[in-house]
Amino acid sequence: MRVVVVGAAGQLGRELVRVLPPAETVGLVRDDLDLHDTGAIAPTLAALAPDVVVNASAENRVDAAEDDATDAVAVNAVAVAAMARACRGLGALFVHVSTDYVFDGRAGRPYTEDDAPNPESAYARTKLAGELLARSLAPRHAVVRVAGLYAHGGSRGKGGSFIDRILAQAREGRPLRVVNDQITAPTWARDVAETLARLLPRLRAGQAPSGLYHVTNSGACSWYEFARTALELAGVRAEVGAVSTGELGARAPRPAYSVLANARLAALGEPALRPWRAALEAYLAA
């Protein structure tokens, strides 16, 4: 099973390339495929003759998209449509990675794959558009929603992962202020990658249906609790100030509660991903 990972320099992309069989995996970074050049997408993928294409790329500068969504639309929607069409032509499975931000956060309980999305930011609207395009244009597909993703090296667009930034600021003695009114399920990208490594062959063989899949570590916490736990586990002493989302003055709205329930994974008999604290501890030890 030949797998092409688009966005192989990103948090999840790097982990996918790490866990998938090297002889059967091709990772594409921006120098290999610029997603703003939609005309290059189909021929690039066709030349690689994939059985599966995983789109782990995203334009995820959430606040910047409120001012100008051009890049977000191009990468999160237009390029997704081009990849989905290419996969349809190749008879390949298309796996597209999306986000918990497609929900408005008002449910007050974990969202399942059956819950209706209601994105409130420009970024989130482009991500939902990508989901809909992937599902409508690629007959064989899986849209995988993740939440609070982190990995070693982090997101280049955000200056590293949340954990990397928190630990660096604490060690430098800089003040830490973290929101305490956004509840999510922080998720180590490696755990998502290992789950997908098991799921891809089942999807490819038709043993798992096309559709939506939530893939996150279990449990829930605020970003404030997550930061304090990271410092505790890393043995770094620092004061963390709890602030509200409103106090931070972010331009884009964020869901107050965006915990995802991995209902469809459970229905397939897939093991639950470990609790977020256990994943964080393993991440810090890796």
Predicted region positions:
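SDR active-site strand-loop-helix element
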Residues: 6, 28, 56-57, 94-99, ...
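NAD(P)H-binding glycine-rich loop region in Rossmannoid oxidoreductase-like domains
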Residues: 35-77
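C-terminal amphipathic/interface module of NAD(P)-dependent oxidoreductases
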Residues: 229, 255-286
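Catalytic helix-loop patch of NAD(P)-dependent Rossmann-fold dehydrogenases
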Residues: 67, 74, 79-82, 102-144, ...
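Adenosine-cofactor binding site in Rossmann-like domains, unifying the SAM/SAH pocket
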Residues: 21-43
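NAD(P)-dependent short-chain dehydrogenase/reductase
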Residues: 135-184, 190-198
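Mid/C-terminal beta-alpha module of Rossmann-like enzyme folds, strongest
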Residues: 195, 202-252
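N-terminal Rossmann NAD(P)H-binding glycine-rich loop of SDR-like oxidoreductase domains
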Residues: 1-20
